[in-house]
Amino acid sequence: MGFLLLTIASCGTSKKAGRNVDYHVLARAAIKLDFDIDEDDDWPLMIEASTWIGTPYKYGGEDRFGIDCSGLTRTIYRQVYKTELHRNSFEQYKKDVKKVSKNNLMSGDLVFFSTGEKGKVSHVGIYLKDGKFIHASSSRGVIVSDLNQNFYKNNFISGGKVK
């Protein structure tokens, strides 16, 4: 009887890094992010990121009514890692990170792009896994994109591990 209760109880939640995680929450996050979330993934990041999918873009915005790219990175970092980032993508690139190559990106690293003036950082997202990152697109709101898409591949500046 004790084994049966343990088995049933273990079907609903898991303890990772000192947190109880509901598998239904992870399943919903995986559906919204459109990829599998594995045992070794950064669950708090994946869950928080998934809650922002579909939020409209708003320049200078930092809430669920509208958010821009640096507002998204700043808000998710504050929520998940209790870390404050600067308010714009260029400042985040210059002051908040240690540069990381595309090949060495890990979940939670920031990814920087030049979408305007050539070579100048003007867009930022958060790397999730397997080439996927979350960001606030000015035309589509908060979405997950792939670093291997031509636009992002051609405009990628650097990754960054937050200091």
Label every model-predicted segment.
Residues 42-46, 50, 70-74, 105, ...:
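Extracytoplasmic/secreted envelope proteins and their assembly/folding machinery
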Residues 32-33, 55-107:
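Catalytic cysteine-centered active-site loop
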Residues 12-26, 32-37, 99-100, 117, ...:
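Aromatic- and glycine-rich peptidoglycan recognition patches
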Residues 108-110, 131:
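Structural motif
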